[in-house]
Design a protein with these regions (language model features):
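Extreme N-terminus of proteins, especially the signal/transit-peptide cleavage junction
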Residues: 2-9
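An amphipathic, aromatic/His-enriched active-site/gating alpha helix that lines ligand/cofactor pockets
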Residues: 5, 32, 36-44, 65-99
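Short, well-ordered beta-strand segments in beta-rich or mixed alpha/beta enzyme
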Residues: 9-17, 47-78
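Short, low-order "capping/linker" segments at domain edges
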Residues: 101-104
């Protein structure tokens, strides 16, 4: 019996730490950002997870998932990424950004 090839998609993950005082403006910007990015060809989803750290700051994880590595590459090079959106609203604190393959 032949095995089916694995389903693979391609993803970015960005992590940022922001001040709680920045949250109201950032939340509205994230809603607009999500609507904008999900219109890009090949974007399956944009998800943001939030946790409040012990010092009261907020830790955000932003994930985008793409159909092909080419679509992800174009987004990272020229698209309106999470990092670019944060810079536009005057928020600093990007901790790391990764490009990954999503297996499940």
């Amino acid at each position: 019996m032949a095995a089916a090839p694995p389903f693979v998609s391609y993803a970015t993950m960005s992590e940022a730490i922001v001040a709680i005082a920045d949250w109201p403006v950032l939340y509205a910007s994230l809603q607009t950002h999500k609507a904008h990015v999900q219109e890009y060809p090949g974007c399956q989803r944009l998800e943001v997870y939030v946790a409040v750290d012990d010092d009261g700051s907020m830790r955000l994880h932003c994930y985008t998932t793409w159909d092909t590595p080419e679509q992800l590459e174009v987004f990272v090079e020229r698209g309106y990424t999470f990092e670019r959106m944060l810079a536009d609203v005057g928020v600093t604190g990007v901790e790391r950004s990764l490009v990954m393959e999503k297996l499940f």
